[in-house]
């Protein structure tokens, strides 16, 4: 035992034990001083408001952007990641529908959700108050509803307060009127419904250039109830009417403020500048109206801001011609820069709309804009900021056809957090459509496919028009090695019902016969897969009593040609029987190349009956090459009297004689 103890004493302690020992002795020595000093006060930081995706964005920033991975809102599973634009929207909105269902269950069964375990309580977990005509309400209820942007309940509570003769302060009336004017008496979409905003915004923007203001509603009633009207009351109503294009009333209120000497704020003047094109018809009168409003602002001692600049440029975009709008725009930009107002992305969007018109002369202003804003981070300052990137990429493709400029725009989009300004799903789809199209038409195919593989399918799913451009580029470059990949993507993206794409990919495979045996087999598989999918599509259409164009002769002929090149006689025979038996249902005739390929394969497989049947089809449909095909069958196969008789009957005795070339070679 003594020897064991001695051996333990000779062992060197582990470094971790030495560190622990030092810490222990240090803590003992400092315990006396710590006891004498005052205890440290713990300060709890204030709560930070976070959106549902803030933590995810913080984690994502640590690893960078990965275009090969699906968006985090989709399940990371090959069978659950959407592979089409429709599926992307369906999956995302289904998830959103689950959130809405949870909110509905909580609201409909509010009695079951009265427990408050969180401290402090989380308002989002608590069912909202339900109001009706019999509710006992107070002014504080209206204040909460206005603060929570619950428009319909706020209207109901305001009317109940008025009905019960409960006085509402002028300040609260002002807040109520601002809420109604901003949302036009309609309920706003909750902030947590991110996906619905993402997929909905592009649709709602299309119908905004028309009057949607609700006349004689509560906002106007509150305005007329206020006896001592102040400038903020006029400002709220004018801005609401201008936003929803009730331009006549908005301008009449503005004239009333001028007559009464009421001073307005800059935002109200900006809203009036935005509707100048609705107030005046001629271009010169519109510009004069803009100058008049700006002069009034100056006389009232107001300084313009970025909203003023964008409102003026927006009006200039409605002025026709080429010289006057450009002159006005450059003067405006110069004057505002003298005032120290830097343009936002919306300003540059309006400049592109003014200079790069569809039928106007070519302008290279986008080069100057990019020199000005390259490698800068932007934040939203105007709703139209989200239009810049999609418009700039459209200019690169359709106006300038410049791939280098397109890459500069794309680099700016991905600089820091600029991607937040892409807008919505509709603008994002258009942006990448233009980007891929300009690269497809200007870059080498190999370089383009690198970008294609980077973006497709997780970031962008090509539309049929983009897929058509890619197929044409493959045809021009004879790069048939990419066809299997493109066909697999067409299946994923549900493009297999597009007849123009099917005809194009078949034409490429027919006119560019591959030398690689493996590629020949892949082409055969593609052609046969195409045939089976079309057959299912036509059958499904007939079951639903829908009109279908059916198969075309040219399409079936191309599929037959490819199957014959792949030496797949069984499939080729099925295709020929389809062509031969359903002649009345097939539109047009196949090419003679397909018939020749099938006859040659039948000769190779020693099937004289099918070769003669194909000859009969050619003769009955008036192919000029029928005699030549009959001679090919007669000279290449050992035929019995029955087959020879059929050849004679179908194409005549000339097919049984040697051709002139053969006679000359015999001599």
Identify the meaning behind each predicted range.
Residues 2-667:
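A basic, Ser/Thr-enriched alpha-helical scaffold prevalent
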């Amino acid at each position: 035992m003594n020897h064991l103890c001695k051996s333990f004493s000779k062992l060197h302690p582990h470094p971790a034990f030495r560190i622990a020992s030092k810490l222990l002795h240090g803590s003992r020595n400092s315990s006396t001083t710590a006891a004498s000093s005052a205890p440290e006060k713990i300060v709890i930081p204030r709560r930070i408001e976070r959106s549902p995706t803030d933590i995810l964005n913080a984690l994502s920033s640590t690893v960078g952007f990965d275009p090969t991975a699906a968006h985090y809102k989709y399940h990371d599973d090959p069978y659950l990641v959407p592979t089409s634009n429709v599926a992307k929207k369906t999956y995302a909105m289904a998830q959103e529908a689950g959130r809405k269902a949870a909110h509905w269950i909580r609201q409909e069964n509010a009695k079951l959700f009265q427990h408050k375990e969180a401290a402090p309580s989380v308002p989002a977990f608590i069912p909202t108050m339900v109001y009706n005509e019999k509710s006992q309400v107070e002014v504080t209820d209206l204040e909460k509803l206005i603060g929570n942007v619950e428009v319909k309940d706020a209207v109901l509570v305001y009317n109940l307060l008025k009905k019960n003769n409960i006085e509402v302060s002028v300040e609260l009336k002002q807040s109520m009127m601002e809420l109604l004017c901003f949302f036009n008496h309609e309920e706003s979409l909750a902030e947590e419904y991110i996906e619905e905003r993402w997929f909905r915004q592009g649709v709602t923007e299309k119908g905004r250039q028309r009057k949607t203001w609700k006349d004689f509603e509560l906002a106007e009633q509150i305005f007329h109830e206020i006896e001592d009207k102040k400038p903020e009351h006029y400002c709220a109503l004018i801005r609401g009417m201008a936003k929803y294009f009730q331009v006549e009333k908005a301008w009449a209120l503005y004239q009333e403020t001028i007559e009464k000497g009421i001073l307005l704020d800059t935002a109200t003047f900006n809203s009036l500048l935005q509707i100048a094109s609705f107030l005046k018809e001629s271009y010169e009168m519109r510009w004069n109206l803009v100058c008049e409003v700006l002069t009034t602002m100056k006389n009232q001692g107001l300084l313009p801001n970025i909203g003023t600049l964008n409102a003026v440029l927006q009006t200039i975009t409605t002025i026709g011609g080429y010289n006057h709008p450009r002159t006005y725009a450059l003067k405006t930009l110069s004057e505002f820069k003298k005032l120290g107002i830097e343009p936002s992305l919306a300003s540059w969007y309006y400049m592109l709309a003014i200079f790069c018109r569809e039928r106007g002369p070519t302008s290279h202003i986008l080069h100057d804009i990019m020199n000005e804003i390259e490698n800068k981070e932007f934040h939203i300052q105007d709703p139209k900021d989200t239009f810049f990137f999609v418009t700039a990429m459209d200019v690169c493709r359709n106006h300038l056809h410049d791939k280098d400029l397109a890459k500069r725009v794309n680099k700016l989009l991905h600089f820091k957090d600029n991607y937040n300004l892409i807008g919505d799903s509709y603008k994002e789809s258009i942006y990448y459509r233009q980007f891929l199209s300009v690269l497809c038409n200007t870059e080498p195919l190999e370089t383009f496919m690198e970008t294609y593989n980077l973006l497709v399918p997780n970031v962008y799913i090509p539309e049929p028009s983009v897929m058509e451009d890619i197929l044409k580029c493959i045809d021009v470059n004879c790069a048939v090695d990419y066809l299997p990949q493109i066909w697999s993507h067409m299946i994923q993206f549900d493009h297999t019902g597009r007849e123009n794409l099917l005809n194009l990919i078949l034409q490429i495979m027919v006119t560019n016969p591959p030398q690689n045996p493996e590629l020949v087999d892949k082409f055969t598989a593609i052609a046969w897969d195409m045939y089976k999918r079309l057959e299912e599509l036509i059958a499904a259409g007939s079951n639903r009593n829908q009109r279908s164009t059916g198969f075309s002769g040219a399409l079936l002929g191309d599929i037959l040609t490819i199957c014959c090149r792949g030496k797949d006689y069984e499939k080729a025979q099925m295709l020929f029987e389809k062509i031969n038996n359903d002649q009345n249902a097939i539109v047009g005739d196949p090419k003679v190349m397909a018939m020749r390929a099938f006859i040659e394969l039948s000769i190779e497989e020693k099937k004289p009956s099918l070769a003669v049947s194909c000859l009969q089809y050619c003769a009955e449909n008036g192919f000029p090459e029928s005699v030549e095909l009959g001679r090919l069958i007669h000279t290449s196969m050992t035929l019995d009297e029955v087959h020879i008789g059929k050849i004679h009957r179908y194409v005549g005795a000339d097919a049984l004689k040697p051709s002139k070339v053969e006679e000359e070679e015999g001599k």
